[in-house]
Amino acid sequence: MNIRFGLIGFFVAGLLLIPPVIPNEVDSSYFHQALDLSPRAERLSEEMLSNKLVKGFGTHPLVAEEFSGWIYEASKRHRIEAELIASLISVESSFRKSVVSHRGAVGPAQVKPKHWQDFCGNNDLYDPEQNVYCGAMILSYLIDRCQGEYGCALSAYNVGFYGDRWQAGKRYIAKIDRSLDALQNLAL
């Protein structure tokens, strides 16, 4: 007997023993069950990110829980890895909500209202949730502008495109990389 046909027969026999997942009559309750999988999966992803923030950065659990929802939503909106956004926020503000830099950057993502207020749709950049969304929007824009080169985008996020602060940009990229490694190498 050919092994390939033997495996196919085993697979078909296994299918006959498994109860069908899709009901014979598809009613509205089936669709509700299917739609509930997505929010459940999102909650699980947010919880995993929250745990990573606690273990990887030492963030207080309540702060991690709050930020993980915002970060996860921002990552979906702007198609950026949630761990990258979390690393940026960790480096920029250590998840402090109302921090203001000596250069006028505000909030967890350290957004400069003078430069980015209009770009982010005149959101209240002092609101930490809106600040996280705006920071992710800026990073997404910079990634596009840098043609997908994350080092270029992160350096531009920190020091801009022009000027002679390229060494500071390199140090910033190294900090983000260390933070990102801390999150990605966690065993949960």
Predicted regions located by residue number:
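Catalytic glycan-binding domains that act on GlcNAc-containing polysaccharides
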Residues: 24-188
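Hydrophobic membrane-insertion alpha-helices, especially the h-region
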Residues: 4-21
